[in-house]
Amino acid sequence: MRRPLQAALAVVALLLVTACSGGSTDESEEDWTFTDDMGTKISLEAVPERIVAYKGVAAALADMGLGDRVVGVFGEPANPDPDLGLQSPDLDVDALPDVTGGEYGAVELEELAALEPDLIVTTTYGAGDYWYLSPDVAKRLGGTYDLAAINLEKETVDGVIENSERLALALGADEADFEAGHAALAKAGDVVRDAARAAGDPTIIATSTTPELLYVANPPAYADLTYLSDEIGLDVVRPAAKDLDEGDYWDSVSWEKADAYDADVALWDTRGGDKNLKALEQQPVWNKVRAAQDGAYLPWRFEIAPSAQGYATMLELFAGDLEGLKD
């Protein structure tokens, strides 16, 4: 398939710049350098002013005072239920040009080239992968543009925030712009803590589904679940290490054995709307567990901006969900 004209021109321009500067080894001439969480060193002639970002990262950049740098986004389609999707009070993500392709990991190259990005930013869960960019697409983009990744792999909430803020500071953010988010996060943590005590400190299981399997999340693999366990003090069900699938994110269980785990409250994966909740409700063996018998289901919001404000917003919503258990 032919590369769209704009992308081809961008490649030519990049090669010309490289050729013109190839004889210089003096890094002091470079005006902006940054080494991302994958260890990739990025060197540009100036601080990036035009950024295309994964939607969650775009929201986080806005939370940290850099929303005016974001000229386009890519990532998951909008959640069918906006209340369950990415919450971005500082940026209208849906109003930005969306260069997401027609399938997972794809990008509309011609539309991307038209945005003339200085930098493309997404997240990573390790193994050298750029989130929501297939390996082939990431390789192709890397030949034309500079890519940066924020690590989420087995990080705590504080770790994720630190990774995001490190990039934001390198981009010229004012650290004072982080203060409101940190204050909101501390306050939201207190609200969740109070809500958890009022709800009787329920045991929690975090789940996702496919037609064939129940997936039980491993808390250390998820920053939000680690926070609920370590900072709030909730008992979050943790599969045994020997039962974890490759990557240590889940224990996959056949529906015939879906009552192998028990908990007071079940969190359901909100990606794609309420389809995972409906799947749980329709499984007879699963319906033997306490959470199912009591109808104690709460949304597990997967789409979180990796910023202090992003996690604060998630926790505020979770506190409200916990309080709703008493209704």
Tell me what each language-model feature is.
Residues 217-250:
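Alpha-helical, coiled-coil/dimerization segments enriched in small aliphatic residues
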Residues 46, 106-116, 252-262:
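Short helices/loops that flank or line small-molecule/ion binding pockets
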